[in-house]
Amino acid sequence: MKKVTIRNVLSKSFGIKAIYEDGSEKISNLIFRNETLPIEKTKVYYPAEEDQSTIKIEIFENTADNNEEGLRTETDAGNPIGQFTMDLPVGATKDTPIEVTFIATEEGILTADVSCMDQQKSYSIENDLKMSAEEIEKSQSIMERVVNGN
């Protein structure tokens, strides 16, 4: 009998609302469904305007796949699950990098860490990021049947 390994994975994709150069607002996904937990990913963004004093981080969950289309998902295809604002340093320009890091734990906690020069802010959401015990058991049962040829 082959050994079957079941891994805990994200049940949804998570990203932030971003404004693109063409003015469109889309979800920029950082982490994707079916990625193994725990996971940590960082992306760099930039202020939309010169001398922008604050940014609003809007976090969305959605079902996008980790492919070219999934990197930019329409906002109406996602559900907003949290938001927060962060002050930007004085003198921030459109070229000032803003690092956004998503950390998803096996315990079902999603943390968004945002940093820009000397400013930092964190926001945590307890969410159903992972498969439930029932879903894991069901997957394990299916895998065992596949491996055993039943």
Where are these regions (language model features)?
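Acidic low-complexity intrinsically disordered segments
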Residues: M1-N150
